[in-house]
Amino acid sequence: MREKGRRKKGRTWAEAAKTVLEKYPNTPMSHKEILQVIQREGLKEIRSGTSPLACLNAMLHTNSRGEEGIFYKVPGRMGVYTLKKDVPDGVKELSEGSEESSDGQSDSQSSENSSSSSDGGSNKEGKKSRWKRKVSSSSPQSGCPSPTIPAGKVISPSQKHSKKALKQALKQQQQKKQQQQCRPSISISSNQHLSLKTVKAASDSVPAKPATWEGKQSDGQTGSPQNSNSSFSSSVKVENTLLGLGKKSFQRSERLHTRQMKRTKCADIDVETPDSILVNTNLRALINKHTFSVLPGDCQQRLLLLLPEVDRQVGPDGLMKLNGSALNNEFFTSAAQGWKERLSEGEFTPEMQVRIRQEIEKEKKVEPWKEQFFESYYGQSSGLSLEDSKKLTASPSDPKVKKTPAEQPKSMPVSEASLIRIVPVVSQSECKEEALQMSSPGRKEECESQGEVQPNFSTSSEPLLSSALNTHELSSILPIKCPKDEDLLEQKPVTSAEQESEKNHLTTASNYNKSESQESLVTSPSKPKSPGVEKPIVKPTAGAGPQETNMKEPLATLVDQSPESLKRKSSLTQEEAPVSWEKRPRVTENRQHQQPFQVSPQPFLNRGDRIQVRKVPPLKIPVSRISPMPFHPSQVSPRARFPVSITSPNRTGARTLADIKAKAQLVKAQRAAAAAAAAAAAAASVGGTIPGPGPGGGQGPGEGGEGQTARGGSPGSDRVSETGKGPTLELAGTGSRGGTRELLPCGPETQPQSETKTTPSQAQPHSVSGAQLQQTPPVPPTPAVSGACTSVPSPAHIEKLDNEKLNPTRATATVASVSHPQGPSSCRQEKAPSPTGPALISGASPVHCAADGTVELKAGPSKNIPNPSASSKTDASVPVAVTPSPLTSLLTTATLEKLPVPQVSATTAPAGSAPPSSTLPAASSLKTPGTSLNMNGPTLRPTSSIPANNPLVTQLLQGKDVPMEQILPKPLTKVEMKTVPLTAKEERGMGALIATNTTENSTREEVNERQSHPATQQQLGKTLQSKQLPQVPRPLQLFSAKELRDSSIDTHQYHEGLSKATQDQILQTLIQRVRRQNLLSVVPPSQFNFAHSGFQLEDISTSQRFMLGFAGRRTSKPAMAGHYLLNISTYGRGSESFRRTHSVNPEDRFCLSSPTEALKMGYTDCKNATGESSSSKEDDTDEESTGDEQESVTVKEEPQVSQSAGKGDTSSGPHSRETLSTSDCLASKNVKAEIPLNEQTTLSKENYLFTRGQTFDEKTLARDLIQAAQKQMAHAVRGKAIRSSPELFSSTVLPLPADSPTHQPLLLPPLQTPKLYGSPTQIGPSYRGMINVSTSSDMDHNSAVPGSQVSSNVGDVMSFSVTVTTIPASQAMNPSSHGQTIPVQAFSEENSIEGTPSKCYCRLKAMIMCKGCGAFCHDDCIGPSKLCVSCLVVR
């Protein structure tokens, strides 16, 4: 006491209060009581006017918080404190009956009440006993499930506020409920009762609180149960707040307390009706972290789940915790308010809940027809597992799909309840199956078939399917030729792949978006939505066979119906591609076109035409199986089936919004498909490639690949089959899209692919005509449309189409087509250029097989170069393997592997003249877009007067050669590459260019005449040649294309550096290539010869490309290049093939002076392709495979290519690579084909080149080739190479067909180029960029050069642009840069080559890159959205 006295004066409130509490250790006291003790015992000197109570209260508040606090605020009471060290005792007492551990609220309430009642200032002891008594009395309450508040927990002011709010609410409730409820009207002391009751209710309802929470959180979504829960939860909260309320109540006795507890049990807080006290309570005050923490753990966890993720934290123990601001933010506040309002509106009354539920049921009803398509996640119905779906979705184009799959189940409940029923209830696979079953049988079958194709896509099933497909396809390629085999195969695949296909198909159907690529693949099979779905399934595996069979049957039919079928097909195909890309809507469009056929197609599908049906199911397949075939490609998606031809109809005509949309869709789809299709392509490559055999047949297996192509290419193939007899022309006339492919199939009229091969010369004229000649002079306009259509369908399709177009030229081409189709998505396509190679190898080979009638061709001939079988298989396998990582892997693998394969294809080509076609097809496919453009060339030509990207032209061309270039409109050829490179390239490529020009002219004419005769072709070629030589100045265009490339990389420099050093380099590269391609060894010489001529070949179509390829083979590699190659190949092989190609690119033809030259060119083309490949090899990354494939051919051409392409490749590696790859493939094949033809030797122009048989010293060859190319280039350049060449050179193509060759491709390329331009390198698969370089003939040049055409020689310059066009699919895959855009553009261009580029009237404006696709267009065109028209349409 002495110490106390001494310190009394200086003692703080905290010390005084501590002293008091120490004296009465087990007696919690309120601040008033403490003050009384202090005053009584004089523990602190209290001066007057200091408001001691306030000071003490503030001190207690402060010191009861935090770890440092010396006081412990008793939880349930208003202001009752005890010393922290005494807490254990107090807690013990409190926890009598586990009060503390029991509901902290109830505990605090009772204690609070007691303290309040004892407030009167009873002595501490009384207080203590009272407290104890309370504790015991509340003890029952403590029994409540809610967790205890830890001893350290103190009620915070917020809690106090909530208590106040509760108090008020309770008063009202008390009044209201005194009458209503069994609660006796308790006197005011009853307040306490109420509070207890409430507490009890709260504790009872605690479990419900989660629901309450939920109710609050879920804005009115919660049903009555939730509401009741929420009401309970609020009651719980109320309980918390109530705890403090008791304070007011008067002293109560133990029995009162007990009675209270009992009453509370039956008393409940109304949380349903508007009478609820909660309506007038601020829920935010009732619900806070303190009241929340009082709830039982399980309730807290359940309630936390109702909160947004941001408002809950997951602790290290995995338990969720309340975020600091979770219950204290505007969202929770508004939710609480909203819940209160809904409560007051009676929304939670049982009657209302019932009504609401009924409404939801009504709303959520999905139309039955929709229900069968519903999938909780993409691909569910097709049997994809959620993981697979996510993978597919993730890599392809549909992130949302990926996301949705997981999320969908949640969202599904309301709108997708029915579906969910199926999906959730049943296992996913079951669900899928269910859904499939739900769908019409046809649909189911279709699904299956699609699934089959899809397996390629789906990672898990992919390998199996692809293996199965491969084996089936391979084994069935020949067998499939006969319907019986087909059926067997079909059945087999169907059984094995049925489930997968079903699932996949569903997936495809459900998520068209998801993997449009996939869709591409699937679409073919899927397209056979009709009853013949099963067959469609087989189609993928045995699709080639069935298609082939179909093709054979229809071939005859085609001959008769080819014009109409083709037309129908091309339209359908074109439409179909869009359908698949556009997804269902496009299908509808297609439907319109195809409705007449639709019913019939299904039947057809049922029949053995299934494969065709795949392509044409929506088409009037009945008209001819060929029709169905076109559908097949078109059939990218099951939906496409009916509407397969919607877009197509326009393709040839004016560019309608639908066309634009279709194009955009295609591009978009291609992008998505790039990945999906890349995977699919890979799978298709493996499985699809084999299917490759026939544009139609190949499609079966390649349905995945070609099926995708099917949309664009397959239809063509099928169409070709349909128009097998002369569909080429027809195709050209028809629609490039389907037409192109049709053209190819035309070749294989006899059999889809087999026939192609079988009738390479015979059909090739048509095929070429159709494929390449889709650009045939006669059909150019249509082809333009055709090309456009093809473009529109999808880059892949286009490429496929192109490939297919080429296919007719050569069976291999068909394969390539298939392969491209595999690349169907742009991916494959882009890759296809290179994948085309692979496709060619694996696909082309198959084509060979088809052509030869033996799968062997596929492995054997194809394998010629690398290892046909291995290559083919590898390619196919790789694609399959790649499938999992659709885009990249596929692209890379497909490209690399496929490229080599294409070489193989090339090699094979020699084996069979068709095989060269195969190689060409790759190139052709690349070129095809160009060709398409070329065809459109005339269309575009009008617009080619001024460079579309003047600034680019100026900058890229560096203004030296700009005059020409500037003049050139370079329609989308962003590549107005530097002119400078042109020079170097020009020099070395001059000769080639000249030759190319000549060849191109000749080729062009030959393209027209190709169908007629080699001789005629020669004449035409010569005529054209003479014509085109003047076009040589077109080099500018070439340059422009090249520029494109350069712009990506230092193509210019490369080209510039081409000079001797580069040439030497190239020579060495060529030598390497030659060595590599010893098989092609023989070809290499000719290839080299062709390489010179190649430029011409490139110019032509193929030849032009080669020349370009040689000088700037890379450039020539562009879409056109492929075409050119094809042309050349055809030419070399038989003027027919070439002619066809030329036909496709009549303008290109000029390149080939004569059949011999054509042959030479063809060979050169082959070589060029090889060279390009080599060049690519330099850009190995980009076009490794292509390099291989193109090796021998490339060897010679490579020097130039190495120089130009090498650098160009490097710069536009991906583009170049792809282009080269394709070109190379085509070239190789061509070369081979040509070699076999031996025509190349005949090529006088490229005479100095080597006979195809010759295996000159690699260096010599390369040197000769370069020299020849240079000479030609010089001439051409002199004439126009200088202007054109720069472009070409710039492009990568170098001199290539800067003039003509470039022109033609440019036509198509313009669109592509820009895309490519943006990211040539990025777009490894976009080798098409090179195609870009290839100049098409005058016509093409004109058309193509809207932006980059010199002036008079529209065709010449244009070629370059085309390059990009081919790239679309790949580029789509390579979203990396412009490549992606290119697909759109390419498509657009191809699709509506009609002048997408040429239609742009702001050539002089600055060009900017589209953010969506990477395509380049004018600032005015793109506008503030920074999106091109295609992207805008798609969006």
Swiss-Prot record:
Residues 182-195, 451-463, 506-527, 593-603, 750-770, 815-827, 864-875, 926-935, 1013-1029, 1200-1225 have a biased composition (Polar residues). Residues 11-86 form the HTH HARE-type domain. One of its GO terms (cellular component) is PR-DUB complex. The record marks 20-21 as: Breakpoint for translocation to form KAT6A-ASXL2 protein. Residues 274-383 form the DEUBAD domain. InterPro entries: ASX-like_PHD, ASX/ASX-like, ASX_DEUBAD_dom, Asxl_HARE-HTH, DEUBAD_dom. Residues 690-707 have a biased composition (Gly residues). A motif (Nuclear localization signal) lies at residues 174-178. Keywords: Chromosomal rearrangement, Intellectual disability, Metal-binding, Methylation, Nucleus, Phosphoprotein, Repeat, Repressor, Transcription, Transcription regulation, Ubl conjugation pathway, Zinc, Zinc-finger. A motif (LXXLL motif 2) lies at residues 887-891. One of its GO terms (molecular function) is DNA binding. The modification Asymmetric dimethylarginine is found at residue 641. The keyword tRNA processing does not apply. Putative Polycomb group (PcG) protein. PcG proteins act by forming multiprotein complexes, which are required to maintain the transcriptionally repressive state of homeotic genes throughout development. PcG proteins are not required to initiate repression, but to maintain it during later stages of development. They probably act via methylation of histones, rendering chromatin heritably changed in its expressibility. Involved in transcriptional regulation mediated by ligand-bound nuclear hormone receptors, such as peroxisome proliferator-activated receptor gamma (PPARG). This is Putative Polycomb group protein ASXL2.
